[in-house]
Amino acid sequence: MASRARLVAQGVAIGLVALLFILLAWSLLNDKGGDLAKKANRGDRPVAPSFTLERLDDDGELDLSSLRGKAVVVNFWASWCAPCKEEAPVLEEIWAKGKQRDLVVVGLDAKDFRPDARRFMRRFGITFPVVYDGPGGTTDDYGVTGFPETFVIDREGRVVAAFVGAVNGEDERVRLQSAIDDALST
């Protein structure tokens, strides 16, 4: 009798663990980013958190507020992030086409090592400005939940749209271009 009760208890325990695993997987798959991303994608246009960070592509620092009057695409990435590698050429293309239209792409490397980030930049031929947020303070301010995440900011410093995950599929690229056009029109 005791072995039957033990089998039932083990079955219940396994069932609970499986249920928790399923709930965790569902939660991760349906995560659409932090509050800032959710507000932007609802159409609220929250003010983009300001930052002043060390540049990896050049000397000095980059202050987001110095870009006021331009549309800005801020892409959060890390050298160890596989989807970031797929997305890098897309962002470089957007930068090459958009800089004549008052569009600035800013790469924000976080939770990474500087030498690894610079190798990533060389490997993928990144020419847009890149800043370093080593421990992730700015990443936390934006509510970034994973890499990559991309925020489109209008000329007035408000977040027009946010993209959780790589922007490399056709649908995502169309949505991103639409958000950029919207940001440039303000």
Regions found by a protein language model. Name each.
Residues M1-S50, E54, T186:
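N-terminal targeting signals for export/organelle localization
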Residues K70, A88-L108, R122, R173:
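Conserved helix-turn-beta segment immediately C-terminal to the redox Cys motif
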Residues S50-V72:
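A short beta-strand-turn-helix
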Residues V152-T186:
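Thiol-/selenol-based redox modules, centered on thioredoxin-like
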Residues V106, R118-E156:
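Short, internal strand/loop/helix patches
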Residues F76-E93:
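Conserved redox-active cysteine motifs that mediate thiol-disulfide chemistry
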Residues K70-V72, W77-W80, G146:
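Short pre-active-site segment immediately N-terminal to redox-active cysteine/selenocysteine motifs
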Residues A78, A110, D133-P135:
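Active-site loop/turn elements of alpha/beta-hydrolase fold enzymes
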